[in-house]
């Protein structure tokens, strides 16, 4: 039974165990990204260039793929694969690059809370493109599960945390005295719709080409991350003056890069052997990991809305993957 049908790929128990471990690891690493990034902040801001961190992440992925290919060269299929099979991954890298940059530009046209809530529409766009492009049909039960995921993400973004109460006397912070009002401009709404469509398209398109090609996953990743390095090097070179390439990097920043690189490789395995829908569940379930780490590392306080979001995620998983 396949992931799309609600099962776990693989017939043998060891393979099921490895797949389950991969899903748990990917969920944990995805959820750890934001808290680890917050620990990098100095005086309320990231001290290094985001473009250099992204480029380092892509380089790390590329090196890990190359090492994997060298170690397992004896298991390669006979014959040299035609390099034209690398071409489709250029579009995949371009879509991911556009998606990552849109996230930055969106912040100019709406407040962070509005972005966090409305960006959950990418769950719906991914599901729609998954059905249209890959020819899969979702049952009413599975459709309801995805709606619950969207609701859970919106709940979590709208009030899953609150700042710890400051009992010490002192002047109120500027952010507290003048909170940013909820707002979104017409251009921001258009960009948000574009972001959700590109997010869904990048996921579904990558799944499509990975499953169509009979090539080792490590080789496909090598193609993808080679284009990713080229694209992000161009973005870094064109980003204008700023801190040096490694300026501002700390131990936490290195951990962020390694975490993102390894999780990217795990997510590619999900796309190859699972589905874009599985990826959506990983991202949604990672909210729980994010919340726990934020509470432990950043002393943020969980609210009742967080537990509502966690309940909705649990219901969605049971509906989608449980027996009818």
UniProtKB/Swiss-Prot annotation:
Keywords, comma-separated and alphabetical: Golgi apparatus, Membrane, Sugar transport, Transmembrane, Transmembrane helix, Transport
GO cellular component, one term: Golgi apparatus
Principal subcellular localization: Golgi
Segments in the Cytoplasmic topological domain: 1-18, 74-85, 164-180, 236-248, 301-324
Database matches in Gene3D superfamilies: 1.10.3730.20
Membrane topology category: Multi-pass membrane protein
Residue spans, topological domain Lumenal: 40-52, 107-142, 202-214, 272-279
GO molecular function annotations of the record: pyrimidine nucleotide-sugar transmembrane transporter activity
Catalytic reactions on record: CDP-L-ribitol(in) + CDP(out) = CDP-L-ribitol(out) + CDP(in)
Top-level division of the source organism's lineage: Eukaryota
Ranges that cross the membrane: 19-39, 53-73, 86-106, 143-163, 181-201, 215-235, 249-271, 280-300
InterPro entries associated with the record: Nuc_sug_transpt
Localisation: Golgi apparatus membrane
Family under the similarity heading: Belongs to the nucleotide-sugar transporter family. SLC35A subfamily.
Known function: Mediates the transport of CDP-ribitol. Does not exhibit CMP-sialic acid, UDP-galactose and UDP-N-acetylglucosamine transport activity.
Quaternary structure (record): Found in a complex with SLC35A2 and SLC35A3.
UniProt name for this protein: Probable UDP-sugar transporter protein SLC35A4
Gene behind this protein: Slc35a4
């Amino acid at each position: 039974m396949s992931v799309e049908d609600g099962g776990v790929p693989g017939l043998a128990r060891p393979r099921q165990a490895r797949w389950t471990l991969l899903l748990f690891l990917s969920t944990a690493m995805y959820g750890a990204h934001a808290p680890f990034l917050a620990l990098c902040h100095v005086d309320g801001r990231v001290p290094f260039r985001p473009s250099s961190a992204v480029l380092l992440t892509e380089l790390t992925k590329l090196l890990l793929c190359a090492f994997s290919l060298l170690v397992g060269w004896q298991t390669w299929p006979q014959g040299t694969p035609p390099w034209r099979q690398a071409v489709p991954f250029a579009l995949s890298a371009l879509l991911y690059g556009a998606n990552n940059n849109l996230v930055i530009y969106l912040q100019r046209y709406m407040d962070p809370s509005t972005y966090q809530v409305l960006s959950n529409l990418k769950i719906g766009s991914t599901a729609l493109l998954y059905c249209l492009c890959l020819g899969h049909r979702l049952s009413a039960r599975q459709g309801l599960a995805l709606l619950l995921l969207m609701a859970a993400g919106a709940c979590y973004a709208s009030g899953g945390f609150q700042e710890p109460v400051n009992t010490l006397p002192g002047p109120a912070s500027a952010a507290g005295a003048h909170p940013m009002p909820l707002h979104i401009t017409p251009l921001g709404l258009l960009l948000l719709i574009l972001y959700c469509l590109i997010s869904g398209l990048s996921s579904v398109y990558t799944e499509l080409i990975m499953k169509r090609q009979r090539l080792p996953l490590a080789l496909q990743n090598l193609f993808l991350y080679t284009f990713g390095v080229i694209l992000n090097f161009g973005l870094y070179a064109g980003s204008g003056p700023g801190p040096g390439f490694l300026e501002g990097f700390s131990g936490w920043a290195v951990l962020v890069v390694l975490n993102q690189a390894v999780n990217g490789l795990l997510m590619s395995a999900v796309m190859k052997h699972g589905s874009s829908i599985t990826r959506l569940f990983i991202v949604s379930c990672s909210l729980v990991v994010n919340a726990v780490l934020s509470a432990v590392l950043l002393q943020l306080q969980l609210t009742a809305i967080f537990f509502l979001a966690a309940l909705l995620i649990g219901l969605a998983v049971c509906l989608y993957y449980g027996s009818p």
